[in-house]
């Protein structure tokens, strides 16, 4: 007989009053195979959103749930859907039909949901089949997958409507519709797709909307798909960010690079870190800069193949990489409209008002980003997103290298750390208005409004009972590193950034093909594929990787030199480098005195001339 243990692992009697009513996964009447999978995944008890939503979904009601990031919303809708499919298979084992359609705004989130389905159905894999339509396969392969009628379909709205219009995706037997991250779906440009899907989905389908916020976009989706839904406004959402220590540093534009170098080289931040920058060029500039000091990092942006992006996140969660530089460029390239914009799908999106239940935050809390001088067409995938939805695990620090343009985006960024009751740190680098534009090579347009955005962020966090504290560095100790930062930053030219950007895209395209083909058959070799290799700017200065002892702060020496720091070579050997280079050039046919191929004349005509 199993004993019920409380949170302190102390056995509780059955008639212990209110504690006996505490919900567990067993009390939710889930299939034993699902319970076994939950135990394998180390799920001890349901979170608030799971305890409230699962019984409602099992009873057949439409649900609109607001819960914070990392609260377990994915399991809250997947478990009851899997339960209903298993019950259907018990009644009719041979029946095949598409029972659930799960819509997500990004490919990364689709892959995450697909992995969750596989995990939860690990002990009933023969009965549960799922398909991810966002994977880049040929149309013929996708039609073959859909023709087999998998039980669960995960897709973006665009892919779903394409397959529906081509009759590849049959929704006639659909019983469940899920819209995950519902507040983002319309702001990613899927409004027309959602309206078309609303016409294609049969009546009576149970609809579940999951969202971190309740915005007017969620209300629009509720009107399209739901029938008198039960609205869950969980109080647990009030605790979002409670375990995050928030700091801000005011610095010049080039000092952002200096502070970042000092933070990671002196190990002022322990653990994994996500660095948010404004656009893709900034991500490669920062990566090349850190490479000068031997600091490895991964770049995550919309230009990389989706397989590579997913693999980077997976390896980061496993602890293979410690630093991710994420290009959160949605606001910079014009995808978030200006105030007063009449765009239907975005007028109340990222810069939009929130209803009264969202603590009274409104458009006045957002700062409009400066207009771009050159309106270039964006090459960014609309189904890419990094600051929302993706399940980054055990992130110790979020570094806002470039401050976002809205207080809401700031909240979503720092939500990558301090998840599941853990603590975290968020550090933002702020450029004062009087220092903006002083250093042209590192200047960034959105930094012009940093102080105004910071004021709104402080105001919003204060309403939540939290504080953004100033982070004070010892300027005298930091100035000692300034000349090294200047040398490294000078080497990272615009040409070097473009070359690195092109090189990594080509390499990741190759890696992406390998991920799809070769590594499916050789999973052990997948570990050899790394995304944090050096991109090599035009001028490499090996001495910058070593920090001289005289630059080390007194308090930091013990921590960094307690162990063997190893041999630091400066590429100097006992060989004569000039003689070695001369021999190498002679072998390449670049001239020389002994037997060079095409290296000039074999004999001096003046020396062979004889006069009598």
UniProtKB/Swiss-Prot annotation:
Compartments (UniProt record): Nucleus, Nucleolus
Q: Where is this motif: Q motif?
A: 23-51
Q: What class of enzyme is it?
A: hydrolase
Acidic residues bias: start-end ranges: 351-368
This protein's GO cellular component annotations are: cytosol; nucleolus
Q: Which reaction does it catalyse?
A: ATP + H2O = ADP + phosphate + H(+)
Question: What biological function has been recorded for the protein in this entry?
Answer: ATP-binding RNA helicase involved in the biogenesis of 60S ribosomal subunits and is required for the normal formation of 25S and 5.8S rRNAs.
- Protein name listed in UniProt: ATP-dependent RNA helicase DBP9
Q: Which species is listed as the source? A: Coccidioides immitis (strain RS)
């Amino acid at each position: 007989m199993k004993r019920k243990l409380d949170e302190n692992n102390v056995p509780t009697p059955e008639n212990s009053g209110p504690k006996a009513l505490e919900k567990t996964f067993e009390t939710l009447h889930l299939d034993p195979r699902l319970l076994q999978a939950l135990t394998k995944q180390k799920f001890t008890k349901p979170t608030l959103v799971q305890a409230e939503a699962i019984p409602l979904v099992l009873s057949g009601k439409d649900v609109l749930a607001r819960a914070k990031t990392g609260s377990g919303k994915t399991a809250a809708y997947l478990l009851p859907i899997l339960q209903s499919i298993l019950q259907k298979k018990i009644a009719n084992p041979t029946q095949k039909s598409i029972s659930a359609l799960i819509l997500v705004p990004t490919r990364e989130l689709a892959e995450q949901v697909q992995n969750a389905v596989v995990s939860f159905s690990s002990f009933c894999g023969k009965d549960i089949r799922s398909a991810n339509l966002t994977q880049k396969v040929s149309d013929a392969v996708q039609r073959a997958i859909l023709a087999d009628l998998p039980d669960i379909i995960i897709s973006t709205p665009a892919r779903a409507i394409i397959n529906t219009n081509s009759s590849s995706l049959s929704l006639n037997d659909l019983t469940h519709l899920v819209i995950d991250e519902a507040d983002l779906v319309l702001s990613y440009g899927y409004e027309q797709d959602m309206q078309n899907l609303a016409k294609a989905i049969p009546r009576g389908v149970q609809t579940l909307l999951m969202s971190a916020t309740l915005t007017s976009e969620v209300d629009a989706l509720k009107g399209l798909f739901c029938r008198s839904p039960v609205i869950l406004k969980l109080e647990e959402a009030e605790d979002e960010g409670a375990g995050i220590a928030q700091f801000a540093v005011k610095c010049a534009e080039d000092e952002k690079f200096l502070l970042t170098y000092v933070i990671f080289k002196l190990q002022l931040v322990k653990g994994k870190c996500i660095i948010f920058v404004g656009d893709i060029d900034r991500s490669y500039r920062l990566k090349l800069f850190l490479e000068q000091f031997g600091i490895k990092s991964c770049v995550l942006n919309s230009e990389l193949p989706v397989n590579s992006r997913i693999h980077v996140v997976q390896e980061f969660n496993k602890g293979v990489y410690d630093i991710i530089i994420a290009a959160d460029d949605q606001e910079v390239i014009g995808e978030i409209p200006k105030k007063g914009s009449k765009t239907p799908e975005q007028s109340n999106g990222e810069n939009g008002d929130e209803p009264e239940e969202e603590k009274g935050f409104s458009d006045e809390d957002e700062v409009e980003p400066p207009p771009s001088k050159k309106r270039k067409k964006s090459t960014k995938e609309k189904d890419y997103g990094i600051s929302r939805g993706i399940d980054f695990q055990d992130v110790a620090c979020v570094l806002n290298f470039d401050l976002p343009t809205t207080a809401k985006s700031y909240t979503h960024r720092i939500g990558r750390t301090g998840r599941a009751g853990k603590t975290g740190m968020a550090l933002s680098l702020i450029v004062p208005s009087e220092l903006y534009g002083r250093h042209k090579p590192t200047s960034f347009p959105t930094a012009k409004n940093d102080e105004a955005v910071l004021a709104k962020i402080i105001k919003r966090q204060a309403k939540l009972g939290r504080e953004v504290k100033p982070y004070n560095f010892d300027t005298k100790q930091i100035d000692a590193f300034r000349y090294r930062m200047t040398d490294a930053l000078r080497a990272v030219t615009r040409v070097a950034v473009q070359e690195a950007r092109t090189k990594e895209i080509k390499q990741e395209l190759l890696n992406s093909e390998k991920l799809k083909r070769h590594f499916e058959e050789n999973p052990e070799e997948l570990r050899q594929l790394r995304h944090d290799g050096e991109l090599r700017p035009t001028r490499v200065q090996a001495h910058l990787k070593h920090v001289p002892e005289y630059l080390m702060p007194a308090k930091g020496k013990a921590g960094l030199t307690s162990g063997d720091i190893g041999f630091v070579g400066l590429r100097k050997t006992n060989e004569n480098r000039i003689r070695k280079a001369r021999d190498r050039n002679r072998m390449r046919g670049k001239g020389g005195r002994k037997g060079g191929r095409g290296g000039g004349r074999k004999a001096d005509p003046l020396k062979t001339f004889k006069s009598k």
